[in-house]
């Protein structure tokens, strides 16, 4: 994937190697898609997945090193946040029965993260990650970490 990104965003060319890498990436994606139907996804696994999505943002994506050529890191942030938020939304009715305050805290933290991301919206997408100030990178990391803490407690619904 890195070679494809470099070819597209740094070298500005698509050569035989890029095409070969793209074909392999497509093949791998199709295999993954076929295997996904056979997985048994439990509520506990989904809840852990939501926390893992946030951890990925706060530990690796926030540095800007993942999308070093395309600088599309904010798209990845948003995708991870949306994934975690979808899982929260699915379990929110059950969580509200067990712990309304926790549910409200989670929603408040999602709103904060999304508001920070919205600062960098550009039409239907996002500005390059280089446009994000160091202060906002820290604020975003702090907001994601603040969201992860209550989100990790959502497993209360499986007890």
Residue ranges and their predicted role:
Residues 1-159:
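Mature extracytoplasmic or organellar-lumen-exposed domains after removal of signal/transit peptides
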